[in-house]
Amino acid sequence: MMETQLYIGIMSGTSMDGADAVLIRMDGGKWLGAEGHAFTPYPGRLRRQLLDLQDTGADELHRSRILSQELSRLYAQTAAELLCSQNLAPSDITALGCHGQTVRHAPEHGYSIQLADLPLLAERTRIFTVGDFRSRDLAAGGQGAPLVPAFHEALFRDNRETRAVLNIGGIANISVLPPDAPAFGFDTGPGNMLMDAWTQAHWQLPYDKNGAKAAQGNILPQLLDRLLAHPYFAQPHPKSTGRELFALNWLETYLDGGENRYDVLRTLSRFTAQTVCDAVSHAAADARQMYICGGGIRNPVLMADLAECFGTRVSLHSTADLNLDPQWVEAAAFAWLAACWINRIPGSPHKATGASKPCILGAGYYY
């Protein structure tokens, strides 16, 4: 009997808080489970430099290459810590899948930029490395995002009912998993991104831990209505978005300057929840169960807002109820995509991205 294979996935999302690495076990293209996790936070200087690259400026090409190398060294460190925690050697790993750090996402121009020096990462880890997952989907006419619905379908689909899977990172995205049709999904809009940016600007904290500051505020109905009127939310799917559309300077155009900072933060929580609810109600009206993953699940104010918006129509759960830690899901998805690459299995959720066909995503690098 052929032995099972181990893969590592590394993910750093639009929240730009650090890198997650997850170890998974596969039997060819069959998922067997996730076995370990490591996390390395971004140093403050690195995070600031990455955020600076979101805006056009001088010497972007040089800065992007230097940051790609720094990120890849940090990714390699995270992978090494994961291997050490599991008493494994690089030779035990079939492949490593690395998403990289998104700094520009422009599907309307046919590109999405994730920083990672993949040959350097392969050299540092001494593991065959797969990356640049979004480019193949974009080349086939897709949005290049979200890429996780195919993974969600492989793990979480139920043949009796429609399920929704919600990932709340910097951007929130949903996967809709019908029992008898292909999975699809899209970005619903901001997840934690605006809340984090507001918290950083007004309290000099990386994020609102446990929603403690939002809990002290009140929802501003007029502000909420103005935010919800953004045309993105009326666009049909497939669609994807990012900081290019929903940055702090966008929010500030709706403020008169006299708002209480706690009230604005509280309103942003409801804004995320309402856009998710509207998206699910429109695209998956028959879904009665929604499984949540990503950093947003740790914010009790946001979770309460989601529960209030959905009411009794949809039951909310953690992906832990389906045997995958909500903090591990995205990194595990890129380990799974690396396994798809190795086994020549199309991993693209083309019904979610709008690509013309299923594609084998990524490019491989030997060490």
Curated annotation (Swiss-Prot):
Gene Ontology MF, one: kinase activity
Protein name: Anhydro-N-acetylmuramic acid kinase
Keywords of this entry: ATP-binding, Carbohydrate metabolism, Kinase, Nucleotide-binding, Transferase
UniProt family annotation: Belongs to the anhydro-N-acetylmuramic acid kinase family.
Enzyme's top EC category: transferase
One Pfam entry name: AnmK
Positions bound to ATP: G13, T14, S15, M16, D17, G18, A19, D20
Catalytic activity: 1,6-anhydro-N-acetyl-beta-muramate + ATP + H2O = N-acetyl-D-muramate 6-phosphate + ADP + H(+)
Organism in which the protein naturally occurs: Neisseria meningitidis serogroup B (strain ATCC BAA-335 / MC58)
Domain of life of the organism encoding this protein: Bacteria
GO biological process, one term: 1,6-anhydro-N-acetyl-beta-muramic acid catabolic process
InterPro entries per UniProt: Anhydro_N_Ac-Mur_kinase (IPR005338), ATPase_NBD (IPR043129)
Its job: Catalyzes the specific phosphorylation of 1,6-anhydro-N-acetylmuramic acid (anhMurNAc) with the simultaneous cleavage of the 1,6-anhydro ring, generating MurNAc-6-P. Is required for the utilization of anhMurNAc either imported from the medium or derived from its own cell wall murein, and thus plays a role in cell wall recycling.
Pathway: Amino-sugar metabolism; 1,6-anhydro-N-acetylmuramate degradation; Cell wall biogenesis; peptidoglycan recycling
Gene3D superfamilies membership: 3.30.420.40
Documented EC number(s): 2.7.1.170
